[in-house]
Amino acid sequence: MNLQLDYFSITSFLVFLVVLFRIVSDWNKKSTNLRLPPGPSKLPIIGSVHHMIGLDVDLPYHALTDLAKKYGPLMHLQLGQMSLVVASSAKMFKELMKENDLAISQRPVPYVARVLNDAGRDIAFVPYGDYWRQIRKISRMELFSVRKVQSLYYIREDQSNKMIDAIGGSAETVMNLSKAVSDYTSTVVARAAFGSGCKDQDKFIKLSLEMVAAAGAVSTLPDMFPALGFIPVLSGKKAFLQNIQKEADKILDYIIDEHIQRTKSKDYDGKESDKEDIVDVLLRLEKTGELEIPITTPDIKAVIWSVFAGGTDTSSTTTLWAMSELMRNPKVMEKVQAEVREKLKGKKEILEADIQDLPYMRAVIKETLRLRIPGPLLLPRETMEPIEVDGYVIPEKTKILFNAWAVTRDPELWENPESFIPERFIEKQIDFKGTNYEFTPFGSGRRICPGMNFGIANVELPLAKLLYYFNWQLPHGMKPEDLDMTAKFGVVCGRKNDLFLIPTPYNIEVEN
């Protein structure tokens, strides 16, 4: 009996080995025939996932940079059922974003976006096609044009004054700058999206911040292994996310209905106005009949969520990283404060029109976006057809990931890339509008972030005021080099821990 059992066990094991060998052989043969970019070896089912063991997976852009050093600037990874090509050099960025921009204009829809049921209308993930062209045109010409962003100056001035007053109330004591900046940015975005004085605005802001944080915490496993979609269900994260959205949707329904009722009043003339918020603009365009594809209430909600997800954390994160780097680099802080205080000398109140000639402060912002890029991995693209890049063939429906963090720290492109040196942007004119592929914090090509003008405007004024009105100290006698600069990866890559500083009011000599 034991002999029969042993024979059966040995036979079963041999059959298993033969089957496994065939699977691995077929896998390798298929990969070889595709002429894919180089990458780590792949196992059946899990692909290249095992190569991530031992790497810094909490900050995946670190792990991908380490792998790229071994396999090159164009690298193929098989993560479960996800076929992924990672670009990690400015040259590969240009090859993909410029030479193959149309072929990779599709965006893969992540699991978390599908959970929220707005993936087909969200600005970031809307499928390439007629509706994408329409919402893209609306975004660039109406919602986030230079003129429209400038017209919202009064919101930024008002909210930044409130931020400065709040900080002044904590003078000479340790205060949470992260909270002050986050409150400023989220309120500016809310007022730009649906106006001021709306019912439950503060509650919606709170829910939106919870939504962004919860979305960043949802596992990416269902994207790699669709069969594991039950994990966020069992963990309760899917239900938690949907409950937040359901509660926030009730507020948005009220806001949108309130705007619709306003358009029905006899005083409404249907004309464009500098005081229009995003909901006003969308309803005006719909009412004029200028749109080829009608905009529905779910569409308006999706746009608002896009604005909050893309505009709130990104701007506040950039401002806080800038202040963090300035605290770590006292000489840079001294230089930028000298510029701001010299140009604005004697002004008791700073207006947005006053900060147009601050080249060094703008260089500080650019250097922050380089060294502490809020989105170190740009939102992925997806090939709509096979493409050839650098002699390799990338099949249709392959996801393309851009490791911008690796590019902005490439020693071949940047001298002393780990150091905070704003002067590099004074000496060499490099912009972030998508044509300098060594510096693409907002992406490039057809899928470049349409709200970058809005995002930058939400950084410049508050940063100028923080530098003008206060001198800053680290708490508890901390030395600059001891300031915690640990990052946390999520929807954006911000500080892991809040930034606590001591503000001291600057003695302004007011001009007569």
UniProtKB/Swiss-Prot annotation:
* Protein name, UniProt field: Dihydroniloticin synthase CYP71CD2
Q: In which pathway does it act?
A: Secondary metabolite biosynthesis; terpenoid biosynthesis
Assigned keywords, A-Z: Heme, Iron, Membrane, Metal-binding, Monooxygenase, Oxidoreductase, Transmembrane, Transmembrane helix
InterPro entries linked to this entry: Cyt_P450, Cyt_P450_CS, Cyt_P450_E_grp-I, Cyt_P450_sf
Location in the cell: Membrane
**Gene3D superfamilies, A to Z:** Cytochrome P450
Superkingdom of the source species: Eukaryota
Q: Where does heme bind?
A: 436
Role this protein plays? Monooxygenase involved in the biosynthesis of limonoids triterpene natural products such as azadirachtin, an antifeedant widely used as bioinsecticide, and possessing many medicinal applications including anti-tumoral, anti-malarial, anti-rheumatic, antibacterial, anti-inflammatory, anti-pyretic and diuretic effects. Catalyzes the conversion of tirucalladienol to dihydroniloticin.
Q: Which SUPFAM superfamilies does this entry report, sorted A to Z?
A: Cytochrome P450
**Which reactions is this enzyme annotated as catalysing?**
tirucalla-7,24-dien-3beta-ol + 2 reduced [NADPH--hemoprotein reductase] + 2 O2 = dihydroniloticin + 2 oxidized [NADPH--hemoprotein reductase] + 2 H2O + 2 H(+)
Any transmembrane segments, and where?
1-21
Q: In which tissues is it expressed?
A: Mainly expressed in petioles and roots, and, to a lower extent, in leaves.
Instruction: Tell me the classification of the organism that encodes this protein.
Output: Eukaryota, Viridiplantae, Streptophyta, Embryophyta, Tracheophyta
**Gene assigned in the entry:** CYP71CD2
Q: What is this enzyme's EC?
A: 1.14.14.-
